[in-house]
């Protein structure tokens, strides 16, 4: 039996991973057991199993063809998992690079994953900026609230494109400061069967 495959995305600092983990805890109490898979981790595990890299830092140095092959294999690996249980893929809709925005889920990955739903977690650029500034555990590029808003707009555009290519629905979930529970509840309601 095929289960639901949901992709959850958001800009760094929006709280997508946090909101997803909390939603999954609530669903587990209802005997709805999603497995959360970070796409970057799945790629690393594939590359490591193929003896392409030894540590995660080497991933960035791989040539484009190797990256593409690993992405495709990671997508296939996750697609196999969905036969056993529902899956939430934690990833980025777009990645901001010095040369522009890069699709987080290129067509060859979408072809393998074939998601049912894409969730974009958002809040205001100002809130994300404040979260990033107060998070001393991460080293992030300095951006303005306007830069963050642009990145969120690009995430929305990419998510809709992914929906067009796969037939997946696209849902925007707000994760506003002080209102985490509301965002979690909204995600719980769409992850239920």
From Swiss-Prot:
Source superkingdom: Archaea
Enzyme class per UniProt: transferase
Residues the record lists as binding ATP: 10-18
Enzyme Commission number(s) from the entry: 2.7.4.3
Coiled coil (UniProt feature): none
Main location: cytoplasm
Recorded GO MF terms: adenylate kinase activity; ATP binding
Record-linked Pfam families: AAA_17 (PF13207)
Catalysed transformations (reactions): AMP + ATP = 2 ADP
UniProt-annotated location(s): Cytoplasm
Family recorded in the similarity comment: Belongs to the archaeal adenylate kinase family.
Protein's name in the database: Adenylate kinase
Organism the protein comes from: Methanococcus aeolicus (strain ATCC BAA-1280 / DSM 17508 / OCM 812 / Nankai-3)
Gene, per the UniProt record: adkA
